[in-house]
Design a protein with these regions (language model features):
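Residues in well-ordered beta-strands of folded domains
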Residues: 49-51, 114, 145-147
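Short nucleic-acid-contacting surface segments enriched for D/E, G, S/T with interspersed K/R
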Residues: 113-127
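Generic structural motif
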Residues: 20, 53-55, 71, 116-118, ...
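OB-fold single-stranded nucleic acid-binding module
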Residues: 130-150
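OB-fold ssDNA-binding interfaces and closely related basic DNA-contact patches used
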Residues: 1-95
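Beta-rich interaction modules in large eukaryotic scaffold/regulatory proteins
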Residues: 91, 95-117
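Intrinsically disordered, low-complexity regulatory regions enriched in Ser/Pro/Gly/Thr
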Residues: 105, 118-122, 135-140
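A generic structural signal for short, non-catalytic loop/turn and secondary-structure boundary residues
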Residues: 27, 43, 104-106, 139
């Protein structure tokens, strides 16, 4: 079972960071798991329910890509940008450069989807799963993926 929060329900004060471990994906990097702790549960990561306006999903090589109109999703993009900024600021890595990968992807009007088989629906809902932070000698950012809700 996954507990999904709306952006309005999300609370930065419920975020905790685990100790850094060796990153298995980025060479010479670290991974810091994020925990979301509410009064009656703790989640490994953050799960946010997002509803985009005017989407078009297409096959992109062996994956899927969702295109959307930036102007019609401006408020949602701004909210996600603020969440990303606040999470990276909360971890307080001085001397390193934050990488805003979620916002960079959104401002281009598309997201890459992680799914093997996508069913056609009229549903414009997605889950943004933020599992942690990655860190290198110079940069740091969030580890995330977008999942289509069927």
């Amino acid at each position: 079972m996954i507990v999904v929060k709306s952006i309005e329900q999300y609370d930065i004060n419920s975020i905790y960071f685990c100790d850094p471990i060796k990153n298995k994906i980025v060479d010479d990097g670290k991974f810091i798991k994020i925990l979301y702790s509410a009064s009656n549960f703790i989640l490994n990561g953050i799960y946010l329910l997002l509803n985009f306006n005017e989407i078009n999903i297409e096959r992109y090589y062996n994956k899927y890509k969702c295109n959307f109109n930036i102007n019609n999703n401006e408020k949602l993009i701004e909210s996600i940008k603020n969440i990303e900024n606040n999470l990276l600021s909360k971890y307080e890595l001085t001397g390193k450069i934050p990488n805003y990968k979620i916002y960079e992807q959104l401002k281009n009007g598309n997201i890459k989807l992680f799914c093997d088989n996508l069913k056609k629906t009229n549903n414009n809902s997605f889950i943004l799963k933020i599992s942690g932070l990655w860190e290198t000698d110079i940069y740091y950012g969030l580890t995330y993926k977008f999942i289509k809700v069927n």
